[in-house]
Amino acid sequence: MAVKEVRFTSDARDRMLRGVDIMANAVRVTLGPKGRNVVIDKSFGAPRITKDGVSVAKEIELEDKFENMGAQMLREVASRTSDIAGDGTTTATVLAQAIVREGAKAVAAGMNPMDLKRGIDLAVEAIVRELRTNARKVSKNAEIAQVATISANGDAEIGRYLAEAMEKVGNEGVITVEEAKTAEIELEVVEGMQFDRGYLSPYFITNQEKMRVELEDAYILLHEKKLSNLQAMIPILESVIQSGKPLLIIAEDVEGEALATLVVNKLRGGLKIAAVKAPGFGDRRKSMLEDIAILTGGTVISEELGTKLESATIDILGRAKRVMVEKETTTIVDGAGSKADIGGRVAQIKAQIEDTTSDYDREKLQERLAKLAGGVAVIRVGGSTEIEVKEKKDRVDDALHATRAAVEEGILPGGGVALLRVVSVLNGLATANDDQRVGIEIVRRAIEAPVRQIAENAGAEGSIIVGKLREKEDFAFGWNAQTGEFGDLFQMGVIDPAKVVRAALQDAASVAGLLVTTEAMIAEKPKKDGQPQMPPAPGMDF
């Protein structure tokens, strides 16, 4: 067992705080419309330029083990916010740093860390309730465009295209982002479908950065039953390998020998392949497999239809221009099915919706109809160089997540102002003791941090901006960092999704509370550099 190094109390917290500061200071420069870029060196290819907080956080690894622990816990804040809301990672990091700093001071002054954490939790619960109460529902296309523009770092073109995409496929519709071969941004709505099933093995992943499988011009095998024996699949697999195209298998399940062999084939580079479970259950699964078959121009291999896997040829496989399989979803874009067949299937489902008396069945039929008829909006992002395309694609991804979050939970005034406006809810909050009251005050001071940082990144004095905002009690009154003007942020189009603000605060407080209550840290002791020199061989005098 490796030798461990242990740090206690203030020594542990100081080392950890240094790591938190290094991480947060690298991320915080990206906050707001006038935030700066961060350049990340990659082991291969050109450096990456980004303004995405979580992308910066994921790249930071510190040499000192104890500092690195602090940095990695702060990275967890950004990652969790990104997973929940898809945006707001920089805000969450700035909030977490502020809470940790204030908390460390309070602990050093002799406050009880557990009571501080309880006070922090009470304050966050109260603020989240108030944020939800004050959130305004998104109803207009213009508001969706404004949210997307803010999240895309003030790029109105990205905001316009995202709003247009949502208008075409609906707020719940599927929108994918790809790299374009031109220098412009393009929007196209293609026949496509998404269902809630992910890859059966992470070894199928082809894009490690996005953690997903991407198959271009793929064949699709649709099977009604479980696949556990590989023998029956060999003829069809050989045909696909000869064609040189990738293959997506959709079946009730793929397990045992069949899954293991597919993974081995993928790893050895012989076959670009992925396997997913078929969506739905029972009769609904059969119907959804048939929907996919019609969309892709394939045939479902089913005993009821008299088709067997052993005798199947490549002609019964479906085709799609692009397939993306993530951990929990599969998206099929531009299937090879004929428009007439798809139209006939849509008409059939509409007739079933009219005939059914069950609300549950009607809801499920409407879901199928939306998947089949809604299509997939593809936003193609272009640029002059590969670096520019990747940077712009990051911003489009952020904007897409932000707009979805806005539709889900509503919008609030942007620029960090919403948190400042709800701080009054902390005034009458009951606590069990004075240390919990200090925890509440820590949150009261920390929620100024995003406004201060946005102001500093825009070249203004954070304290002056916060002071002017406090002079007015109007909920929507704030400072537009892009123009340097004060006014109604809703009218100016400076808005944040409520879900993003909420998730940023909750995740920041959660991890910061754990850091504040840390009393000891254990890490592996670094090995000493250099090997002992060998003694000179006999007869070798130097």
Curated annotation (Swiss-Prot):
Entry keyword set: ATP-binding, Chaperone, Cytoplasm, Isomerase, Nucleotide-binding
PROSITE patterns (alphabetical): CHAPERONINS_CPN60
Keyword Zinc: no
Catalytic activity: ATP + H2O + a folded polypeptide = ADP + phosphate + an unfolded polypeptide
Domain of life: Bacteria
Any one GO molecular function term: isomerase activity
EC number: 5.6.1.7
Pro residues: compositionally biased ranges: 533-542
Family matches, as Pfam families: Cpn60_TCP1
Protein family membership: Belongs to the chaperonin (HSP60) family.
Name of protein: Chaperonin GroEL 2
Species: Sinorhizobium medicae (strain WSM419) (Ensifer medicae)
Taxonomic lineage: Bacteria, Pseudomonadati, Pseudomonadota, Alphaproteobacteria, Hyphomicrobiales
